[in-house]
Design a protein with these regions (language model features):
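Short alpha-helical transmembrane segments in multi-pass integral membrane proteins
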Residues: 1-15, 69-137, 181-236, 292-356, ...
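Transmembrane alpha-helix boundary and packing residues in multipass membrane permease domains
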Residues: 15, 19, 27-31, 48, ...
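Membrane-helix boundary and inter-helical linker elements of multi-pass secondary transporters
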Residues: 34, 71-74, 153, 182, ...
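N-terminal transmembrane alpha-helices
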Residues: 3-31, 35-36, 49-64, 68, ...
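Transmembrane helical elements of multi-pass membrane transporters/channels
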Residues: 10-29, 133, 144, 167, ...
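Helix-terminus/linker motif at the lipid-water interface of multi-pass membrane proteins
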Residues: 24-42, 111-121, 177-184, 239, ...
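Small-residue-rich hydrophobic transmembrane alpha-helices
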Residues: 41-101, 141-160, 264-329, 362-374, ...
């Protein structure tokens, strides 16, 4: 096994576990509030979706810090390392009040927006109650993302994973107490989430303080605006790419709705099942970005080799996942609670989605090389074009049912994937050292 593959596996494994833990938090809350009725489940479900979208905002700070810190670490540039850490925290301080305070103030119209017109008054009230705690608590999630970004930039992906598992363990322990025993309902679910993440954040800050080299200037010093601007310039394309892809997934629901109600339900259930696979692609992408940035900082031009290993790793995972979905589709959708026409449609979707998964895996893996090289902006354009094309093709092919939608997804992903592969082959071998 080559050096690059070993390093990618070592970095990606913990990142994958961390991403799975993030999804598990919403599942834990849903399981406990399910005993309170459908309105409570709807409130927690839509609030979790909102949180996922908001997470894309703070990726500007977390991802930007990771890449700049990894590059500076590779170059042995202590001042650039300090600047990356400062820039990440400055962005957190700027963005968090806008989201937390603004979200709390606008929780009522936000609840109405995400639940849609004609929503049940009970569900609206419960969603507002959940947002009243969860949106101010987003400050904790944002801070945890920055802590994780710093640790990953230092080459440590295991500690963020452990912190996520700690938070989930606390949520699992607190949910039955707060939701049921103390009769706090959805407020209890929101409170347990904030408390669990807060404890994990405090532990992360303590560990981070020990990991950062001793010396002045890590969290204070001159040039704060320049530091923040550098992190934002690096992280913004990654954040935009995430948000565009999330928006495209949501928009595709409207196209699927033209096919039928069972197909919409099947698409929603199958998409959740696909998260297990797609999160592994994003884990490889993060690992590739960290490794690439570190190599560039060290003056080693090996982006082509790293990209090839990332393609092999992510593509291999996609092939295995596609084969598993093809064989186990009925059991997967059944295990997620689907039955009848929904189960049939969900199984068909999972059996047709394999080519899309493989192309997506390759595109996401190559994205890590561009992120680590500071050229992620090109990915934003490719992703945006791909999402627009996906919607147009899905609309045109919706007459063929879910197989037509899967074909549209594959075709729309093939074009940006081919463009990314061509750009990867033509990467300038000259190494740009961080200034």
């Amino acid at each position: 096994m080559g050096e690059h593959r070993r390093r990618l596996l070592a970095l990606a494994g913990p990142v994958y576990a961390e991403l799975l833990a993030g999804v598990a938090a919403g599942i834990i809350n849903t399981v406990w509030v399910a005993r309170l009725g459908g309105d409570a489940v709807a409130a927690v479900a839509v609030a979790t979706n909102v949180e996922n979208v908001l997470l894309g905002v703070v990726l500007v700070a977390g991802s930007g810090t990771t890449v700049l810190l990894a590059r500076a670490r590779g170059a042995g540039d202590a001042e650039a390392m300090r600047g990356a850490v400062r820039g990440g925290w400055v962005l957190w301080a700027l963005v968090t009040p806008l989201v937390a305070i603004g979200g709390y103030a606008g929780r009522a119209p936000l609840a109405a927006l995400v639940l849609g017109g004609g929503a049940d008054p009970g569900a609206l009230a419960l969603t507002r109650a959940y947002f009243a705690l969860a949106l101010p608590g987003i400050a904790v999630l944002f801070a945890s993302n920055v802590v994780g970004g710093v640790l990953k930039g230092l080459g440590d992906t295991r500690t963020p994973m452990r912190l996520s598992l700690l938070a989930n363990g606390l949520i699992l322990a607190l949910d039955p107490l707060l939701v049921l025993a103390l009769h706090l309902g959805v407020r209890g679910a929101a409170l347990s989430t904030v408390l669990g993440r807060s404890v994990a954040l405090l532990c992360g800050l303590v560990l981070l303080r020990r990991r950062l080299p001793r010396g002045k200037g890590w969290l204070a010093g001159g040039g704060l605006v320049a530091d923040a601007r550098g992190v934002a310039a690096t992280g913004l394309p990654m954040s935009a790419d995430f948000v565009i892809r999330m928006a495209g997934t949501l928009a595709l629901v409207g196209v699927v709705a033209r096919i039928g109600v069972a197909e919409v339900a099947a698409y929603g259930i199958a998409t959740k099942a696909l998260y297990v696979a797609t999160m592994s692609f994003y884990a490889v992408r993060q690992a590739t970005a960290i490794h690439t940035a570190h190599l560039i900082g060290a003056g080693r031009e090996e982006r082509a080799a790293v990209g090839r290993e990332a393609l092999r790793l992510s593509g291999g995972i996609a092939v295995l996942a596609s084969a598993f979905l093809l064989a186990a589709g009925p059991w997967i959708v059944g295990g997620l609670g689907a039955g009848g026409a929904v189960a049939v449609a969900g199984t068909l979707y999972l059996r047709c989605v394999g080519p899309y998964l493989l192309l997506l895996a390759c595109y996401i893996a190559l994205g890590g090389v561009f992120e680590g090289s500071g050229r992620a902006a090109v990915l934003v354009r490719l992703t945006a074009y791909g999402q627009v094309l996906q919607l147009a093709l899905a609309y045109a092919l919706s007459g063929y049912g879910l197989p037509g939608v899967c074909l549209a997804m594959a075709l729309a992903t093939a074009l940006p994937c081919a463009a990314a592969a061509r750009l990867h082959r033509g990467l300038d071998p000259a190494v740009t050292r961080p200034s």
